[in-house]
Amino acid sequence: MPDAARKYQPYPTVGLTDRTWPNKVIDKAPIWCSVDLRDGNQALIDPMGHERKARMFGLLLDMGFKEIEIGFPSASQTDFDFARWCIEEGNVPADVSLQVLVQCRPELITRTFEALKGATNPIVHFYNSTSELQRRVVFEKDVGGIKRIATDAAKMITDMAAKAGGGYRFEYSPESFTGTELEVALEICNAVTEIVRPKPDNKLIINLPSTVEMSTPNIYADRIEWMCRNLDNRENLIISLHPHNDRGTGIATTELGLMAGADRVEGTLFGNGERTGNVDIVTLALNMYTQGVDPGIDCSDINRMKDVYEYSNQLKIPERHPYVGELVYTAFSGSHQDAINKGMKALKKANTSLWEVPYLPIDPADVGRSYEAIIRINSQSGKGGIAYVLQADYGLNLPRNLQIEFSQAIQAITDAEGKEVPAKRIHERFLETYVDQPGARLKFLDHHTYPDTAVKGRRVIEAVILDKGKEVTISGTGTGPIDGFVDALSRHVGVEMSVLDYSEHSMQRGSNASAISYVEMEYPGGKLFGAGINTNIVAASLEAVTSAANRIVGRKAR
């Protein structure tokens, strides 16, 4: 990589030594504005058609968004037509404002008002880029020229709104605010405010976007607090944030911006947007929810939200995405699973509504997820999750090496079928592989042992087995039944085998409880497990040896 100090320069700080935002907390939800249908849509490889837009729009209404940016109607006929559909057929509640975006160009402003005819309290969101870099290399204008673009647009928009009979709301964005000197951003915003003349019953939205995330979140917060202190007519302004996620800190940037005095947030569901995306409104809302703050939008059916997002955007949500990912409520670490299990049990016993479960900052049920999701198994699952399923639902405590081995069998299923494997199917596959073994060559029936008169301390075992359906008696010697039976089977099948590890446990309580034994066997070329279940612990262990031998013989025969 090139020398960083020669190629890049650090972002300037604000010098706000008396900043107050670090001592603030977020104790109420901001005004939310979804920009999924505009900023999110323009970032898609395959932009939404009408059906995909309509489905997303319906979800946003159901979630309770009161401000929805529906498009850029002057930029395309598709967006214009969708705006008309929303107004004429979208069944928009009276308390919902449709927002549209427009550049500060006369012909585009005219077209925008045509698109908004008949809308109730629509928001006209006009913008122009104000950054030092774009002033210099894109527009080749000084600050006065850039300010004039904004003020000319503000005059035209307010005049057209008045001629249309009023009822319009206005939003102005100094685009690339993060690349604009604070004094310049302030000068332009104040000039726009003077023209719009906002009032208590029709405040002007001043949107201060992190169009490109260029600094740590604390510096953005300083900039927001500085603007809130210095903007004219602040009491009649709504300060809005529009963060992107270029540095991966969009959530933190937004939260600190709210602490710094902002009133409103523009973002998208699950963070779709240009480059690395817009800020994720769902994560923001649920972060507030888990701090005891009503987020003001309904995220109780996160599975539907995910489905609509993936259908409308033709994008997949990562498994580890906060709150919604397939694996966020699933623990694979054995210690994590144990802590969750104990926490859930303790919660049931506690006489409180307070949620306190290790590793789960939110109750999955609050967002429409089931508790089974904590132990669900799919193609991304590991040995820990599979072991947890078998332990929690069927009382099987698999040894670690068996967890690793059996997880490969489940992985084969998920890879082949591409869908979730339910707990019942996992248990059936375990029994089929290690216990019942339909079609296997060998089956243990009975045994007896007696002292080996030739070698002190050793015993002879005589066991009755089925070999390809034929009853056979085999014998061997060893220090105990397992050792002797392994010797007998090795001689019988002609493969040298030995026990590497053995464990057993009861599956239920009581004198007639079944026990399960696990045996790891080594043979020339590898090692494999077997398992046996019986009310007699010795019989269970010999069945486990037989199980492992069947798998070894089957492997050798390939």
UniProtKB/Swiss-Prot annotation:
Main EC class the enzyme belongs to: transferase
Cofactor(s), by name: Mg(2+)
InterPro entries in the record: 2-isopropylmalate_synth_dimer, AIPM/Hcit_synth_CS, Aldolase_TIM, IPM_Synthase, LeuA-like_post-cat, LeuA_allosteric_dom_sf, LeuA_N_DRE-TIM, PYR_CT
Subunit structure: Homodimer.
Superkingdom of origin: Bacteria
UniProt source species: Mesorhizobium japonicum (strain LMG 29417 / CECT 9101 / MAFF 303099) (Mesorhizobium loti (strain MAFF 303099))
One GO term (biological process): L-leucine biosynthetic process
Family classification: Belongs to the alpha-IPM synthase/homocitrate synthase family. LeuA type 2 subfamily.
Keywords: Amino-acid biosynthesis, Branched-chain amino acid biosynthesis, Cytoplasm, Leucine biosynthesis, Magnesium, Metal-binding, Transferase
Full protein name: 2-isopropylmalate synthase
